[in-house]
Amino acid sequence: MKGIKVVETAFRDAHQSLLATRLRTRDMTPIAEEMDRVGFFSLEAWGGATFDTCIRYLNEDPWERLRELKEHVKRTPIQMLLRGQNLVGYKHYPDDIVRKFIEKSYENGVDVFRIFDALNDIRNMEYAIKVAREQEAHVQGVICYTISPYHTLESYVDFARELEALECDSVAIKDMAGLISPHDAYELVRALKEETDLMVNLHCHCTSGMTPMSYYAACEAGVDILDTAISPLSWGASQPPTESIVAALRDTPYDTGLDLEILKNIKKYFEEIRKKYSSILDPIAEQIDTDVLIYQIPGGMLSNLVAQLKEQNALDRYEEVLEEMPRVRKDMGYPPLVTPTSQIVGIQAVMNVLSGERYSMVTNEVKDYFRGLYGRPPAPLNEEVARKVIGDEKPIDCRPADILKPQYDECRRKGEEMGIIEKEEDILTLALYPAIAPKFLRGEIEEEPLEPPAEEMAPTGEVPTVFHVEVDGDEFEVKVVPTGYMTIEEAEPEPVDVEGAVKSTMQGMVVKLKVSEGDQVNAGDVVAVVEAMKMENDIQTPHGGVVEKIYTAEGEKVETGDIIMVIK
């Protein structure tokens, strides 16, 4: 048998899974040439959440990141994760945007396009696959792996046949939550090798603890490629350690042929990077969590879910959110939990828990999901929930992109009017993220500070522990024994109660004000849209009247309970 090829994920999925996608380009380029020497099948370095995080938190141009990496990586193909018709966003984009984005991605340095759809709806992948093939790139079609009564071995094999019919070069089993058991990995890989002529790539996270065993079972079944992460960025919600997998397969028919000495140097570099980012590294994302076999939360989502709950000052509700997620997933027809459905399901679970009433608050993305605008769910929707979310609306049954009008020229016009377009890629950035891109392109985004790790203990010897105290002429020796150190946080201000106030239901950014001062509105009208946890939330007025005062502006951040406007 031929040896196993390896995809290294340190530049994309590994830090997305453990560091909330916060790794800076300046911390990638110093080691990129060394990684290029290893002989990986590819370096996954772009796509996924990296695009969003670059412009939202890091004040980095994601296109420039791609170009810089390509300058350092000459031999190893650079791979990106592309969400089919969603590209690197959270909704469907029209075909003209998809074409331009893929063409520019290839032009700037992407060699391998790993293309998936969160619902395994082939209609949402066809056009992206077609355009990527036109670039003569390596096109890898993806099966999003999950477990439900509707996801069977036969259904996965049938889907792989559809990908082969579209002339993909390889197929990836994308196990976002580390759910696949050794037995199931063997059976699925063997079936794909028997029923198709495609190279098979297994991509797993270590969340459940089973992944190294599943990798070896996949090798025995004939897998061609495995995804791994250099050890300081491995385990937990990330992939298995590259060095461990290389060593485990050495002197077997599956030997990768990779040099552990070169990998050791790369490991040392990332050990320092891990220390640098230790304030972001969350213990929840690092640990093995067998509850994932119940909740099915993917690796990349765990660290982001923790970060988002922290933003809402609701980390104490984490367990409740985990328990709510399978219920929401069932209501929505058992979608695989991968972007964007992981965000859609996860944030709805957060809202159900924080609001105290299921589906009393619903994001626009959830409404669109029930309308069929993300594609065909694997299973029937909960009809009662559907009525609560979209009323009597009938979902569409065509390819969602078929009802979208071309947007590229309009985005160009808007961007030029705003004076924010310097290159063609800026038009695409604006098209993908119209809420945040203008601020980024105007240079108004500040890089999120990377805080040093908190000191666990005060330096010894600097704080006196024995005091001589005189009381009414008598002297006493008092020993003070340290028992820990307290972090003092600012108290939360009490919310102001103003008559007629319309308040934000979530912490986030105001992306749209739908009324002006002096407008007449009715109870239930949508008066603003707040983007919270990357999803848009309509703010409805609980009462009618005239808009007396607006206290915020588009692009400004608001906290939960902040007054957006007063209507009397």
Curated annotation (Swiss-Prot):
Temperature dependence: Optimum temperature is 60 degrees Celsius.
Signal peptide: none
GO (cellular component) term, any one: cytoplasm
Binding residue positions for a divalent metal cation: 13, 174, 203, 205
pH dependence text: Optimum pH is 8.
Function, as annotated: Pyruvate carboxylase catalyzes a 2-step reaction, involving the ATP-dependent carboxylation of the covalently attached biotin in the first step and the transfer of the carboxyl group to pyruvate in the second.
Protein name: Pyruvate carboxylase subunit B
Lineage, uppermost ranks: Archaea, Methanobacteriati, Methanobacteriota, Methanomada group, Methanobacteria
